[in-house]
Amino acid sequence: LGLRHGDMLFASYQDKQEEASTSQSSAPVSEDAVDVYWSQQRGLIPRQHDRQFCRHGEKGMCDYCMPIEPYDMTYHAQHGIKHLSFHAYLRQQNIGVPSASTSYVPPLEELSYRVKVPCPSGQHESWPASICTKCQPSAITLQRQKYRMVDHVEFVHSALIDRMLDAWRKTATQRFGYLLGHYEPYDKVPMGIKAVVEAIHEPPQAGETDGIVLGMPWDDEARIQELAEWCGLCVVGMIYTDLEVADPTHSDPTQAGLVSCKRHADSFFLSGQEALFAAQQQSQHKNACRWSQSSLFNSKFVTCVLSGNPMGEIDVSAYQVSEQVMAMVDADMIEASVHPTTIRVKPSDSTRYVPDVFYRYTNKYGID
């Protein structure tokens, strides 16, 4: 180049324009119609004029009659509502319309109890060779989830249940089916959501007197989902029977037509094995959410159980497991035990890291 000692060199450069971000968080999210509806509503709970405390005319308003927020704890306690609806929870967390800034980050993030591979610090080999505080999951404190994704389950016709009961009455074996339907606003809970079931599809199964054997995944799943979409439906949950006649000998006339009550406060409502299966199904049917960094958050998938109530009558009970259970099942941290009321935490090994798990609750005296 003919350079000599002391020569000065000058360099120039041009700024490269950054390409538009195409991350999943900035892409449009196809939410359920009910989520779009509630995101466009204020959700305030109206109150009537209080003759005892209000000191104004019918067209006035004061602190005693002004609308209250959908997450008001006093209103929920007075109406016996134990959990917030999902959209009321979003309002409580002050999650509103996203900013127009390109640097906007959705506030919700899915729980994950897996070890981060590779480590964000990049200072050591990935798990299981080594681990640090930046890539290992924190200790887990189990607690009741404040909100629920679905507040009510409704069947459009009793014949949907009768068909499953007829199979049990004829064969004395349990049955399983997927619930096909849609979601609608539920007016009994502030900003509530209900699952409306319009059909039940029973996949290939082998029924037993005390359980069901399923082939997972079922072969015609894609076809059934496609047919459901053509009808404006989707898979909203699952249902199965857990029935046993109260008098197997049929010798007591007073027990005729009654079934045993297996699930109650002194036994269990959903066994550990059923809770794990529900978590797996919920993880396979996650909820599309614009407020989540991954565009997915929790699940609206419900689990319905046909079993006997304390009166000996057949009743439908609906359940959902929390996001914590879904994350623990995804991380392969828990397993069912021989006791239906207990779930066992797996030990750590060379391929599984399990952090400390604690349980936190408030007793009847309000002590944490």
Regions found by a protein language model. Give the residues of each.
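N-terminal beta-strand/alpha-helix entry module and adjacent surface
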Residues: 7, 13-237, 241-351, 368
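Extended low-complexity, compositionally biased segments
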Residues: 360-368
